[in-house]
């Protein structure tokens, strides 16, 4: 069973590193009022040498990220959407509950309107589907947490002064 997590981990990597920016860019070109505010992205934040210098040795920043990743990604989003809502949605949506759950997950990210299509697509195919298919919330937790692990290594590099 757990070998099935590998294709979904590869899928989230390809999705996040190659396809999300294209899909989100297309979305924003159709609806420019949903564009990301200037200077809002993590990339813009980390491009400032002044900020990078301040974060060297700032272990509190790394700890804050880890706590946020645990409570938001794992305990918040995954156990709420896949552990609580998905099984209950099957009563209404039947075998298409995973699609409805992924769409709901995407619109949960309404505070980042430029990324709604990306959140819907990843929510449906990379988080909700494996959880539904294998009847294990851990499938969604592991795949979704891969994103957090990636960012944890980036932030660790900043704190260690490697960036």
Ranges and model annotations:
Residues 1-72, 161-163:
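Juxtamembrane helix-loop-helix connectors linking adjacent transmembrane helices
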Residues 1-5, 61-66, 94-101, 116, ...:
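Residue-level signature of transmembrane alpha-helical entry/exit and packing/kink sites
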Residues 29, 76-100, 129-136:
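Membrane-interface helix/loop boundary segments of multi-pass membrane proteins
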Residues 51-59, 87, 113-127:
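Short, motif-level signal for alpha-helix interfacial/capping segments enriched in acidic residues
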Residues 69, 73-74, 82-83, 105, ...:
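Active-site alpha-helix of zinc metalloproteases
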Residues 72, 84-93, 108-115:
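Short, amphipathic, aromatic/basic-enriched membrane-interface segments that mark the entry/exit
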Residues 99-108, 114-163:
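Functionally important transmembrane alpha-helices
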